[in-house]
Amino acid sequence: MSPGGPRPSSRKRKLRGRDKGGPDISAVNSFFLKYSFPYAWALLRLREMVRSGSRPGQVISSGRQPGAKLPNGKKGTHVRKIAHFNVDSACPVQSDSESQTDTLQGLDGCASLLRDILKNEDSGSEMVYSENRCNSKPLEGRKNRSKKKGPEKHVPSVVRKEILSSENRKWISNEASTGSDTAQRWSLQDHYRMYSPIIYQALCEHVQTQMSLMNSLALKNGPNGIHAVCHTMSNSGSQATPHSGFGCSPSASVWPPQQPSCPLMVHSEVQTDADNQFESQSQATSVKYGDVPRDPFSVHPGVACGLPHADSPAVAKSRQLDLTSCILPQQRAPKEAELLKCFQTHTSLFPAHGKDALSDSQAYQSPSQLQPAFLATNEEKCAKEQFEEATNEGKHLSTHVQDAKIAKNVQQAENVSQTAEKIRLAKCLLGELKALMEEDSEVQRLVTEVEACVSGLSAVSGHPNVEVEIALALQPLRSENAQLRRQLRILNQRLREQEKTEKGPGNLELFSLQSLNMSLQNQLQESLKSQELLQSKNEELLKVIENQKEENKKFTTLFKDKEQTLLHNKQQFDIEMTRVKMELEEALANEKNLRFKLETAEKESQILGITLRQRDAEVARLRELTRTLQSSMAKLLSDLSMDTARCRMGNSLTKSLLNVYDQQLQQDPAPAQTSIMSYLNKLETNHSFIHSKLLNNEAAIEPDRLCESVLPPQRPPHSDAGTADGGSASGTVSAASVEDSDMDCETLTVIEDGCNVDSTVYIPFARNTSKKHSPLCKRLSPQPKLSVAAAQLVSGSAQTSKGESKPRAPAVCSSRNEAEDAPGDLSSTYDTEDVQLLRKIKEAIGKIPAAAEHAKEQATHHGPSAHPSPGVPVKGSIVPDSSFLNSDLMSDWSISSFSTFTSHDEQDFRNGLAALDANIARLQKSLKTGLLEK
């Protein structure tokens, strides 16, 4: 398990042994064997090299051995298969020297002997293997418990570490061996007899490699490879089991890292990364522990047996060797003995080489060493005994090997129990070291304890001459290695020659391929250049695209701003448009109203112009009418005066009065002077005719006299003093009659024009004259024979006369009486035209309703004035007007009423005409202003 991995929870720190501590025990065991039994250690290394022989038919270079590769995770029983080898394949090629000829003969004999041995032992080895397989089953359950704790891990480095569980390790104590001091020996010759000549050649090659390594220890610093060596121990207190225990021992190898021997994949339960420094070799070696089962009762050192290579003859079906093929202990023990016997036979076949080896080994021998023959016989005896025990019992293998030093020094054999205790202690300490690898303080403590234990073992580790003995024993193998090297050189030369001959026809193809390769390389370079150009262009285009994207972003922001401004402006424009539309609609409505008003105003102006022209025409016609009325009134008065013969001549007008009146008129001229003067002249010219007629009717003068006698007392007290004699009354009557005639004609024309429905009837604004004359008109009481309107006027005059002065009533009554007295005179004297004209005037006056109200207002306004102006007629002149009109209507008019005509009456008449003109001008002005306003 790697140092970084989690530590199992079941692991507890103990100072004395564990229930499952096999890997630590094997590690300490191999470490102890290195220093306590150097000769046995070297022998184990030799056997391990023999086990890891090369495959048949493989060309082996000097000093290098390719390792066999096994598939990971595959477990199975590999039945031993013996290949039939050609004898010539193991023999060196003939050379010119005689030594090579002798070597070839010796090799042929050795190969034939080994073939016979292998053929004879095929059946026996297979039987032993079957027994072994049956006996190995009871311990598989124990193996499973130890192997389930950790996953497989493959260490790819050259220096590898492997933990071998020792559950199947058999510890056999020295007390349970034979009970004597003579140790059983393994026979290398018997062991070598079990192997083929190819394995023998591999053994010789590896020995040569180890010797060359030992000769160059001072120049090398580290190992190039690792060999796993198995130790087989004896245990007296336990039952024999068919599995042999496997330990690990470090050994140096010259195999390169490219071709490691036996790359092992293990189910590691405990793994250590500590490197053990071996002072004897001055070389750092890493320990690789294999996962193998052990027997946990007691620990004793034993003899090591090498782990075979993957192509070894037989492989045990055991769990501790999942990735390496091994030989079962029952098969391995006799085969190692046969191998030793084969080694002795081979050395006997080479006397010359043996002498050379003897002469070489004498330089390294010491007097205390044993001979190689004695070692071989001892090992052969031990191998035979182990083979018999394996075949008879089939359960355990008692392998107790001692070297020459242990045979001479019995005291070292007695100290085995003490060393076992130290080994157990070292095992526990190393287990603690592995468990606490990541903790610095604990690691330091455990390392110090391990060093203390190793210092206790240093007393038994001092045998430098063991390697010299091994070198003497392996001298024939070195000579064999030299022969194999020569054969290898020859084979390599042949191979090179074959390669040269085969290169001929392939040169053209090679040349074509090279040219094609060059062209393809050129094309590749060009394509790379074009690709670089395209990449540069692509980068430029990407930059341009990025710039365009940035510009597009800017433009999009600008467009958004513009759109927002346009939208805002559009909204404002819509608002303005709606407001303008509303204003335009209002303006159109106002325009329509104004047009309608203008049309109405134009129509009204047209109507007003028409009415104005009508008024002008009416005014002109009224003026003509006034003139005609004046003339007709003068004619009427003259006619009436001719009928009245009862008037007094004393009251008639004289020339002197007219002269006085002319003088007054000259002082105050008036526009109506000419008409009045003509009127007076007519009266004066007709006076003589009137006077002649009045003389014939004296009886009719009585009512006039009565009226004249009544009129002076009925005048108001504020009347003018100049009119006390009655002359002012006649002047007022004449002036009022003229004004009445003008106003009546104007009103009559308006009423006549009012018959049209479409035309507008306008009431004249000149109400001053109507105010003056309306009381006069309403006070009139004409005859019922004249018209119905006259009767209405008479009835209305009673109501309107109530607001005026009551002293008028006697005059009215007298006038009525006079009218009643003289109906016949009027009918005889009136002209028909004058009668019709008077009727029209009376009807027109009767159709003006507001005349009475304005007369009341004017009467109240002018009443209090005690000093009336000369242009305004006083109230006292109104009563003679009514009497004058009544006398106009009646036939009893007297000419004496005109005898009182003075300048004051003329002034009133002139003022009335001026007021009429002013009223007409005001009417025209008001019409013009009204048109302008509209």
Swiss-Prot record:
UniProt keyword Coiled coil, yes or no: yes
GO cellular component, one term: centriolar satellite
InterPro entries tied to this protein: CCDC14 (IPR029343)
Ranges where the record places region Disordered: 1-22, 55-75, 128-156, 708-740, 793-829, 852-877
Coiled-coil region: 432-606
Pfam family, one: CCDC14
Residues the record lists as Phosphoserine modifications: 123, 656, 737, 781
Compartments it resides in: Cytoplasm, Cytoskeleton, Microtubule organizing center, Centrosome, Centriolar satellite
Top-level taxon of origin: Eukaryota
Keywords attached to this entry: Coiled coil, Cytoplasm, Cytoskeleton, Phosphoprotein
Subunit structure: Interacts with CEP63.
Role noted for this protein: Negatively regulates centriole duplication. Negatively regulates CEP63 and CDK2 centrosomal localization.
Protein name: Coiled-coil domain-containing protein 14
